[in-house]
Design a protein with these regions (language model features):
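Active-site hotspot residues in diverse enzymes, especially metal/ion-binding acidic/histidine motifs
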Residues: 1-218
Length: 218
């Protein structure tokens, strides 16, 4: 049995959402609106759990959890947490559904693998690697405070993202993983230019070639 985390799948699935979502126009964005747009999953606070006949103590210490109720999936989240924490927690649980994790095995030997994959999925949605690396190429120093203020994430999420990206070389990614790189940079160009304007001279030949490539995407 393969218990190794499937980072490639989590990365590609997150990229697919970034490309097709109309909810994500900039960063930060509403995790609840994204979940509603991309699925039939309902987001509800812990405070509304009683309405569904669920005891809040069943959640233990989790910040969010996903339940099957009446044939539908519901993400319950702890509304007392800070907004960045709630956002990440909701996307983490959303990741379980998108990555088609077997919930019957969530508490078994696959638990750790599932958690790592969904954390990676949520981080890529909230702080896309392609955008961070492009900002870095433009001369901006990437640190925890920058990620927190730019993407609306918690200090913990920002620090973990920096740690993860420091261990990865984007040049080693497969063609499937790189498929949406240019699309994502093009789609969120306004956000990029607002956060870190490109100071390099405009290259008409390069831009023409890029536009021809984009035209082939549609």
């Amino acid at each position: 049995m393969n218990l190794k985390s499937d980072f490639d799948k989590a990365y590609i699935k997150a990229n697919e959402v970034l490309v097709r979502s109309s909810t994500i126009q900039s960063f930060p964005f509403s995790s609840k609106k994204l979940v509603k747009e991309q699925s039939q999953i309902i987001c509800r606070s812990y405070g509304s759990a009683k309405k569904y006949g669920i005891n809040i103590t069943d959640f233990g210490s989790e910040s969010a959890t996903i339940f099957r109720f009446g044939g539908r999936s519901i993400i319950f989240y702890d509304e007392t947490k800070p907004e960045p924490h709630i956002t990440f927690s909701i996307l983490h649980e959303f990741g379980h559904a998108i990555l088609e994790h077997d919930f019957t095995k969530k508490n078994g030997e696959n638990y750790h693998r599932y958690e790592v994959e969904t954390n990676f999925f949520a981080a890529q949605l909230l702080m896309p690697e392609q955008i961070i690396r492009e900002i870095q190429k433009r001369g901006k120093r990437i640190n925890s405070l920058f990620l927190q203020s730019t993407f609306g994430v918690s200090a913990q999420a920002a620090e973990k993202r920096i740690e993860t990206l420091a261990k990865m070389n984007s040049e080693w990614r497969s063609e499937n993983e790189k498929e949406f790189d240019d699309v994502i940079l093009f789609r969120y160009a306004d956000f990029l230019n607002k956060v870190c304007p490109n100071k390099y001279d405009y290259d008409f030949e390069y831009e023409y070639a890029r536009q021809q490539e984009r035209d082939n995407w549609y």
